[in-house]
Regions:
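Cytochrome P450
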Residues: 1-336
Length: 336
């Protein structure tokens, strides 16, 4: 039996921990011995429930009435109601609002359109891999994992290729420490309080303004791209509001660049650190689809998602009181 003091020493909330690598040993201890673990939040009087078992995380994800994504931000940050509304995107909603937003954007993700996005992605990836192979090798991050997702997302959105570096600049600024530059609150002409902007960053203001501009262009000059579908989407006479559109555009650019870039890079590192798994892939390419899912779990760029308990509830072998926060991450759970 693992001593209680060993469990109490676990700290999965400190960013410095992840600079040394994902704490898989601690995640395993929690899964095996305390899968619904009360974790104090450093420098705060409160804390959160760290949920680490697959079945519990699936249950939380499916039960939106008990575990809300909308009650608070999906990150553990303290926001006033007006701040939360200003920053709310698809991932901070529950049904029926979540259902409405999905219906509005579904025309951009039909099977035919997804097949087109897949082919565009394959073409871009093949070109980048051909280039690094012709060069005799190189830095995988700068040659493949960094340019691939941003080139894909600008192609899908309909953003001019020459604006791709600006999209990278802005999305890098959204992640503390990624760009290495702390922005002044008034950067990019921002006058919005930072608490009303995603990531507390004026780069979000710049993404909003860019999204608004290209959205206005597509309303009068529609094209076969994702922005056109977003600005013209309508269900039962309703369309996306300005706030909904801006936050959705920001989410697509950020998720289509930073998180994907990190997952690809971390996934390649994981394969290099586990050469036997790389050999399995080379020997049996049919395993690639399963490998992608495992990379997204093991090398996830997202450390956690927050849910808020809407009532006292039993979860696994623990109890989550009403209004308490639970946090779970793909790389905390065991594979199934």
């Amino acid at each position: 039996m693992v001593a209680a003091d060993r469990l109490s020493e676990i700290n999965i909330a400190d960013p410095a921990v992840y600079e040394r690598g994902v704490p898989h040993v601690d995640f395993r201890l929690l899964r095996d011995h305390d899968p619904v673990h009360w974790h104090p939040w450093p420098d705060r009087s409160s804390g959160f429930w760290a949920i680490t078992r697959h079945a519990d995380i699936v249950a939380i994800s499916r039960d939106t009435e008990t575990y809300s994504s909308a009650a608070e931000h999906v990150l553990i940050v303290d926001l006033d109601p007006d701040e939360l509304e200003a920053r709310r995107s698809l991932i901070e909603t529950d049904p029926p609002q979540h259902t409405r937003l999905r219906r509005l954007v579904s025309s951009a993700f039909t099977p035919r359109k997804v097949a087109e996005y897949e082919q565009a992605t394959r073409n871009i990836a093949a070109g980048l891999l051909d280039e690094i192979a012709a060069a005799g090798g190189g830095d995988f991050v700068s040659a493949v994992s960094a340019p691939l997702p941003i080139n894909v997302i600008v192609s899908i959105l309909g953003i001019p290729a020459e604006d791709a570096p600006f999209m990278v600049e802005l999305s890098n600024h959204l992640v503390a420490g990624t760009s290495g530059v702390r922005l002044d609150a008034a950067a990019y002409g921002n006058t919005t309080p930072l608490s009303h902007l995603p990531f507390d960053s004026p780069a979000s203001h710049a993404l909003f303004e860019y999204g608004r501009r290209i959205g206005r262009e597509r309303r009068t000059d529609p094209r076969d791209d994702l922005v056109t579908r977003l600005v013209h989407a309508e269900v039962d006479g309703e369309s996306l509001s300005d706030v909904e559109y801006c936050n959705f555009f920001q989410l697509l650019v950020f998720a289509g660049n930073e998180t994907t870039r990190t997952a690809i890079s971390q996934g390649m590192l994981a394969l290099l650190e586990n050469p036997a798994e790389l050999d399995r892939l080379e020997d049996d390419p049919a395993l690639v689809s399963k490998a992608v899912e495992e990379i997204l779990r093991w090398a996830s760029p997202i450390m956690y998602f927050r849910r808020t308990a809407m009532r006292d509830t039993e979860l696994g072998c623990g109890t989550c009181p009403e209004t308490s926060t639970s946090a779970s991450s793909p790389n905390q759970i065991g594979s199934t």
